[in-house]
Structure formats: C-alpha cells, structure tokens
Amino acid sequence: MILISVTAVAGIGCIIAAFVMGADPRQIRNYAEGKTSGKLQTEERNIRADQIRKLNIDIGSGNVKLQNGNQDHLIIKKKGSWEPVILKSDGEIEIKQKSRHFKLFWFQSNDEITVILPKGVTFEKVSMDCGNGDIASDSLNITDELVIDCGSGDIDLTTITTSKTEIDLGSGDVTLTMAGTEKDYNYNIDCGNGDVKIGDILFEDDLKKRNINALRWINIDCGSGDLTIDFDNTIL
C-alpha cells in the first residue's frame, strides 16, 4: 500500500512538472495513452520494390526492425507513436517517431516498428539516425551510400552491400556485417575513447588505410562507443 501511494505521488508530481514546463494537457493525455495502449497494428502499403530508392530512419528511443519479405509490397507492424510510412516523390521511405513536445524521466518509450520490405528491393541510399533506440536489419543492398548516426543506441545490420559507408558513433554500439572481405574496403578511422574492430584487428588510434584494388570506402568517426565490422567473405 505504501509503495503504491509513493508511486502515485511521484506520478502526480511528474504531471505537475509537465504543466510547469508548459505542456498542453492534451499532450500529456495523448502521450500517456500512446505509451500504455501497446496495441500492435499491421498495415499494408501498395509500395513496390521498383518504386523505392531511399530509406530514412529517424528515431529517438524506439526500436526498428527491417526484414526482407517474399511479398511484392511493403508491410508494416507497429505499436506506439509513429509517423505514417509513405513513399515520397523522390522515392524515399521514411520511418520516424512522432515528435515529443515534452519529456519526463518516468516515460520510457516502448515504441517499436517492423518493416517488411518487398522482395528484391535495392536502395540508392540508406540513412539511419538513432538516439538511444535500437535498429536491426536483415541484408540490405545499397548502390551508393549507407549513413549511420548513432547516439547511445544499438545498431545491428546483417550483410550490407554498398559502395560507401559513413559512421558517426557516440556512446552506442554498432555491429555490421559487410559483404566481401576486409581487403575490398578502404578506411578512414577517427577514433575517440571507443573501440573499433574491423575483422580481427582492433583499432584504438586514427588511421587511413587503402587496400590495393579496393573500390569501397568506410569512414568512421567513433566517440566512446564500440564498432564491430565483420565480413561474409563473398566474392564481390
């Protein structure tokens, strides 16, 4: 009984704090309802692989999963607060959490979304901006560029095929499996207090490395997080 009373008082105190910070009562109600509903929604979009050129993921504390499907259109499974997933005029699909106009420490996001990609999709560019959420993906085929900006979250990507990879890592963890071998890539590494492991080699200092005949680039700016890059040893 005492624990319940203390929890209730703490919750009321946080709501009062939200009012003091200028939050609209409707924002508080909608935010709380969105956090407690937990209802999984499945949506199907008439978006085919040949219509998709780019993918942009922008999350704060939510979780994103990308899966490769056998269907000819996009399928979305989500719960929590997300912007509608649509195809823009330039062929970009954006996965984005709805904006929060205020934040309270006792609200922990449980937003999650799974995007099942249509069979055979190839992207020109994929961008991932992750605060303290998590992003995981099946294999991705990217012709031009993969851009990762990771704060304190975790990103785990399997079998990435791309010409150029840009990684800006704060205090989170990023794990990538790249197509090919270590010798298929050139590297620019700017390493802070974190660890960068490429294949079997651990890098703790800045480095620029060029491999003979390598045409692909990985550019790394690592803060205090950990980056691990492995290879699937396929022939490119």
PLM feature spans:
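Short, surface-exposed interaction patches in beta-rich subdomains
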Residues: 140, 147-150, 154-236
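Non-cytosolic head/periplasmic domains of membrane-anchored proteins
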Residues: 83-171
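Short structured motifs
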Residues: 41-42, 111-113, 203-204
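Short linear S-[DN]-x-LW-Φ motif typified by the pepsin-like aspartic protease active-site region
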Residues: 17-98, 116, 122, 135-140, ...
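Hydrophobic membrane-insertion alpha-helices, especially the h-region
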Residues: 2-18
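Residue-level preference for beta-strand/loop junctions
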Residues: 49, 109, 212-214
